[in-house]
Amino acid sequence: TERLSDNNVVFNQIERLIDDCNKGRQIEPQLIIISAGTNDAWFPKQRPEVLSCSVAQAFEEPDSIFSHRTPETVRSLAEVVRYDCTLLMRIFPHAQIVLLTPMQSTAIPDLRLFAVAETIAQCGDQLSLSVVRQDKESCVSSARERTARCFTTDGTHTNIEGARRNGYYLANRISSVLQW
């Protein structure tokens, strides 16, 4: 469905991971893969401040000050990626974090999706994290999917073949950047 839920945001998943690790329900992760940006690009009315701050602006504030901010004070995508990733880096210092940009979608204007993906990629660069550019490299092409549904069921969500191909692609890309 095209409805947003707070359970889909990365921060809530991070909170659950931290809580589960603290309570012994989950071991400390060695690898954290964050796939983000699709809803940020898809729902501009619900997320009007997503592109309100550049990556450079999001990284102006020193870490010592930025780390004391609360989740509700980080509104732009660049600030959110910085906040979430630095929190994970602080709590799980031995885990490798890999960021995934969103795949192309017929439901999202290409320029908006690419702006979101570029923001995520630049944040990854600033944080020295590996980034997999699904918007550029995955099997899903919005232009092709507009003509015929090759790898998606609806122009956004992968079908069986799209999931299989993208799964192989992600496995290859992520295994190539593993640091252990």
Language-model features: where?
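N-terminal cationic-hydrophobic initiation segments that often serve targeting/anchoring roles
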Residues: 22, 88-90, 178
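Residue-level preference for short coil/turn positions at secondary-structure junctions
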Residues: 25-28, 93, 125
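Active-site segments of SGNH/GDSL-like serine hydrolases
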Residues: 38-39, 82-117
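Catalytic His-Asp segment of secreted/periplasmic serine-dependent ester chemistry enzymes
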Residues: 103-180
